[in-house]
Amino acid sequence: MKFSYAIAAVVAAAASVQAVETNGQRMARGLKPLPPRNIHRRASRTNEARGATPSGTPSGGDYNCNTGSVQCCNQVSKANDTVISAILGLLGIGGVADDVLVGLKCSPLSVVGLGSGNSCSQRPVCCENNSKGGLVSIGCIPITL
């Protein structure tokens, strides 16, 4: 008798299980794949942990350089580059560390006016020392506009 109840339970369970098509079968018919099923219903510690927040958010086009103005430079290299070091020497600029980025032939760039034809085809940077009229800008940081 116990055996017949066990068989009846197995048959009833098998009959109540619905066949779910695989994602491969759905994609073969041109349908989107199903999202993954959550097999474990209780949350784990990683699910309960608070997600990290970004350290900063870009400010919708009003890019502000903390070190100086936005410049568009024809060339940006480290101060130990042979061309850059020669130009710095000719201008009498000394004491620049070898790993500092230096921009050559820089012109001011208005980030607000980028949509109206004011664009930088070379390399946009923020430079802290633009005292040589755009010929040499020292302490540059590359930026993405």
UniProtKB/Swiss-Prot annotation:
UniProt entry tagged with the keyword Disulfide bond: yes
InterPro entries: Hydrophobin (IPR001338)
Principal location class: secreted
Alphabetical list of SMART domains matching this protein: HYDRO (SM00075)
Disulfide pattern: 65-126, 72-120, 73-106, 127-140
CDD domains, sorted: hydrophobin_I
GO function term, MF aspect, one: structural constituent of cell wall
Function: Aerial growth, conidiation, and dispersal of filamentous fungi in the environment rely upon a capability of their secreting small amphipathic proteins called hydrophobins (HPBs) with low sequence identity. Class I can self-assemble into an outermost layer of rodlet bundles on aerial cell surfaces, conferring cellular hydrophobicity that supports fungal growth, development and dispersal; whereas Class II form highly ordered films at water-air interfaces through intermolecular interactions but contribute nothing to the rodlet structure.
Name this protein carries in UniProt: Class I hydrophobin 1
Organism: Ganoderma lucidum
